[in-house]
Every structure is written in structure tokens, then in C-alpha cells.
Amino acid sequence: MNTDIVTYYKDRAGEYKEIYFKPERQEELKRIEDILKDTFKKKTVIEIACGTGYWSERISETAKSIFATDINDSVLEVARNKGYSKNNVNFQNHDLFSFNPEERSESLFGGFIWSHIKLQELDNFFDKVNNLILPNGTIVLIDNNYVEGISTPVTDEDEFGNTYQTRTLKDGSNHLVLKNFPREDFIREKLKSKAKEISFINLKYYWILKYNI
């Protein structure tokens, strides 16, 4: 079983978009889209873990510019081939933890990345993303809630409390994927010394975290 999450998303690039087609999630996805478009309107945005560009495409409709990054060339290839009418998205391959852009941005977005960060690495994660944006800048993170009977079951947990799912791709390969599902109180506690004006919206399938630094 493959435990390398980079390999998992490389192999999943061609089928990744299917997660956005689930009928029961459309209302929440539209709500998230509206929040992101409003938050990033006329702003410069750094997007981390942009994947196949689902959110890049939507945010670009209102943002001034997006510097979209991912560690995986396979998903970036899919993202680059989408339509961006304002020609305001720049895609580059970067590892978040070694990413040092020449200029800081006004804001930052990360979709479904929190859940793939190990609990013992969260402090470093927030120090890093906070350092990518200008003072008083805005960060928005979204991720999945665990919905009993709907979400892929958690099949493993390590000594730090990180949880893992066993996922099977269409090619039959099995992958043990890090997927944490934090509660709001945990998130607020983790950010209390690193953020201000914390807003947390908890939906059924997703949560939305917004804060300033």
C-alpha cells in the first residue's frame, strides 16, 4: 500500500474533479465559492496546494491575481489547461515548506490541505503560511468534515493522533492517506497566538476558516 501522498495525488489527477460533482454537496460548494470570491475580490492571492485548479478557476473571476502552487506536476498540468478569462493565474511547482516568493501577497488560500498536515507539524505550517502574506493580510482555509456513513472510513491512527483513510483509485491501487478532521475548538486553540479576527463556518460536509495576521 502506498503511503506517499504526493504519489497518491499524482495518480489521482485524472479523476480528482469527481469529488466536486456529488449532488448533495453542490449547495455548500456554491456557498464556499461565494465567500472566496468576495474575500479575494481585487486582492493578490497565493494559493497553496492548488491541485487541478478547481478553486483557482473560480477565485480568478474576482481576484487581482493568483500565484497558484502545488508540489505535483500532474495536477498542475490539468490546472493550466483550464480557462482563465482574466489571464491572472500563474501556476508553479513548489513545496510549501521551501517556498519563498520574491514578494508577499495580500492574501492566501488553501483548499483541503489542513487535513494532510500532520498534527505535530501544524505550528510550522501556520508559521509558514502566515509569513507568505503581508501584515493584516487574510488567510482562508477550507476542508472536509467527517460525515458518518458518507465519508471514507478512518482505518488507522498513529501515536500523534493523526488519522488515515484507505483509498482505492480506479486503477485498483490502494493508498493509505493522511486525513485529519479537526474540531473548531482545536483549530481556535491552535491559532490563538498566530491569528486575529478568526472566523469559522461549520457546514455539514465542509468547514471554512478565515483569519487575519
Where are these predicted regions, by residue range?
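Class I SAM-dependent methyltransferase SAM/SAH-binding core
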Residues: 52-98
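Conserved beta-strand signature within the Rossmann-like core of class I S-adenosyl-L-methionine
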Residues: 136-144
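C-terminal alpha-helical "lid/dimerization" subdomain adjacent to the S-adenosyl-L-methionine
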Residues: 144-191
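Conserved Class I S-adenosyl-L-methionine
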Residues: 177-213
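A short glycine-rich, Lys/Arg-flanked "PGG" loop and its adjoining helix->strand segment in the class I
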Residues: 123-135
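Conserved class I S-adenosyl-L-methionine
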Residues: 1-40, 43-51
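A conserved beta-strand element that flanks and buttresses the S-adenosyl-L-methionine
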Residues: 109
